[in-house]
Each structure stands twice: as C-alpha cells, then as structure tokens.
C-alpha cells in the first residue's frame, strides 16, 4: 500500500518564508534554508517550496535559495514559482529540485505540461491548481482556477482543468483552496474529492489545515494521496512526528521513522 505523504510548504517572498490568510496578509515565518533543515530532521516526507511572488512580479524563482535549500535537505523537494518554459524546469531540476510545480504557465498553455513531461518525465511535473468556489449555496459545487498567486480569475473550471492537465502529462496535482488558505478551518474536502475522483494521478490537498484531524480528513474524505500544511508546522502548533502518529492511529499508512 502506498504511504500517505506529509508535505510542509515553504511559501517564500523576498527570500523569507511567509504565511498568509487567503493569499494575503503575509507574516514572516523564518529563513527557508533553516526551515528546510528543520523539516528534513523532523522526518517530513517531502518539502514544497513556492516562490509566491515570482509569476506576479514576472521574474524567475530565486535559484540561489532553491539550491541552498536543496543542498540542506535530503527529502524530495518540489519547487514552483515563475516557471514558464522548459528551460525553467531544467534550471530548477539542475538547482536541486526533484519535482517542479507549474501553475500560471499551465493555464496559459496546457501543451507546456505535455512538453515538460515528455522531456523530463511526468514523475517530476506537478501542476499547482489554485481554486476558489464560485457556485452559490443552492447550486452544484463549482470552482474556478486563479493564477498569479491567486490574483487573476481565469473562468476555467477547476475539475475540468485538472482532468485536462493530468491527461497532458502532469504526474501530480497540488490542489489549493483559496477560500480555505490560511484559515485553519480544514481543507475544502469537496474540491479535493471532486478532483481526486476526476483524475488518475495523485492529488495533494492544500489550504486550510487547522489541526491533525484535518490531515486525516484530507485523505479519508478528500481522497488525497498527500497532505500539505504550513501554519500548523511553521508556528510550532504540531510537529511532523505528531502528525504522522495521529494519522497512523487513524488507520492511514504512514512512513514512520524508527
């Protein structure tokens, strides 16, 4: 049985780890390289490193921070932010990323996903989906894709888009609920489940973890293969070990360190 992965997320702005609420109100959470070392030592299964202003400010990811983070950390590292070309993917992989997250560029050109997957293998291409619920209370649930760090609406249906990019070669989908991001009120389980049911690739649940039960729900109710969290780890509410123990006690298959 495949083990559920716990993935701390480092959102980086101007070389510092930050944590926001619904993509805004960013507060400082430390040095990315030191954070990476701490999570590596704590037994995190993977680390997600997102340069959250790269697409918005139209510049590349901070490669020196990426390479120093990769150097300090032995768990798989997913890096995203400002990835626009096959050359960008290659540069990040050479800098030490194991997987590369594509967001805005995948929306603008889904064929880019196919091109990158063909060149480097679908196992290292992660499409990051930032979605917001746009349906009313009495309508069938519907979510819209946003790009540029959640700033730009696209009119695209999130579930349809997920299906399309997974067919084009995305090896994994990182699904973030913008409504839930930073609120600590739990994942948008309906969104996670709708996408997990629509695709054949692993889905990472993201946005809204407030406690350890939320991680369990992401897998059990949301159908996620991995759970991503930031606030509960960055600010010392829980450790990765506590999260793993809690999820294992709930009957989920986890990689437990000796």
Swiss-Prot record:
NCBIfam families: hisF. The gene is hisF. PANTHER family: IMIDAZOLE GLYCEROL PHOSPHATE SYNTHASE HISHF, IMIDAZOLE GLYCEROL PHOSPHATE SYNTHASE SUBUNIT HISF/H IGP SYNTHASE SUBUNIT HISF/H. IGPS catalyzes the conversion of PRFAR and glutamine to IGP, AICAR and glutamate. The HisF subunit catalyzes the cyclization activity that produces IGP and AICAR from PRFAR using the ammonia provided by the HisH subunit. The keyword Amino-acid biosynthesis applies. Heterodimer of HisH and HisF. The active site is at 11, 130. Its EC number is 4.3.2.10. It is found in: Cytoplasm. GO terms for molecular function: imidazoleglycerol-phosphate synthase activity; lyase activity. Its main location: cytoplasm. Belongs to the HisA/HisF family. Gene3D superfamilies: Aldolase class I. SUPFAM superfamilies: Ribulose-phoshate binding barrel (SSF51366). It is an enzyme of class 4 (lyase). This is Imidazole glycerol phosphate synthase subunit HisF. It catalyses: 5-[(5-phospho-1-deoxy-D-ribulos-1-ylimino)methylamino]-1-(5-phospho-beta-D-ribosyl)imidazole-4-carboxamide + L-glutamine = D-erythro-1-(imidazol-4-yl)glycerol 3-phosphate + 5-amino-1-(5-phospho-beta-D-ribosyl)imidazole-4-carboxamide + L-glutamate + H(+). One of its GO terms (cellular component) is cytoplasm. It holds the Pfam family His_biosynth. Keywords: Amino-acid biosynthesis, Cytoplasm, Histidine biosynthesis, Lyase. Pathway: Amino-acid biosynthesis; L-histidine biosynthesis; L-histidine from 5-phospho-alpha-D-ribose 1-diphosphate: step 5/9. GO terms for biological process: L-histidine biosynthetic process. It comes from Methylorubrum populi (strain ATCC BAA-705 / NCIMB 13946 / BJ001) (Methylobacterium populi).
């Amino acid at each position: 049985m495949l083990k559920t992965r716990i993935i701390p997320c480092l959102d980086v702005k101007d070389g510092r780890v930050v944590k926001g609420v619904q993509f805004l109100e960013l507060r400082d959470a430390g040095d990315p390289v030191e954070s990476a070392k701490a999570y590596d030592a704590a037994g995190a299964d993977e680390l997600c490193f997102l340069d959250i202003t790269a697409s918005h400010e139209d510049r590349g990811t901070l490669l020196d921070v990426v390479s120093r983070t990769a150097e300090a950390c032995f768990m798989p590292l997913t890096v995203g932010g400002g990835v626009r070309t096959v050359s960008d993917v290659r540069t990040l992989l050479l800098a030490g990323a194991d997987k590369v997250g594509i967001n805005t560029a995948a929306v603008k050109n889904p064929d880019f996903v196919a091109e990158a997957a063909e060149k480097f293998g679908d196992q290292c291409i992660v499409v990051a989906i930032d979605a917001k619920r746009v349906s009313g209370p009495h309508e069938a649930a519907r979510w819209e894709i946003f790009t540029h760090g959640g700033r730009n609406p696209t009119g695209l249906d999130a579930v349809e888009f997920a299906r399309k990019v997974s067919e084009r070669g995305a090896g994994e989908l990182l699904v973030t609920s913008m409504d839930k991001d930073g609120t600590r009120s739990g994942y948008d389980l309906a969104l996670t489940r709708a996408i997990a049911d629509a695709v054949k690739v692993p889905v990472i649940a993201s946005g809204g973890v407030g406690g350890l039960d939320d991680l369990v729900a992401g897998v059990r109710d949301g159908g996620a293969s991995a759970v991503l969290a930031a606030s509960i780890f960055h600010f010392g509410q829980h450790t990765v070990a506590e999260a793993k123990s809690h999820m294992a006690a709930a009957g989920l298959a986890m990689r437990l360190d000796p």
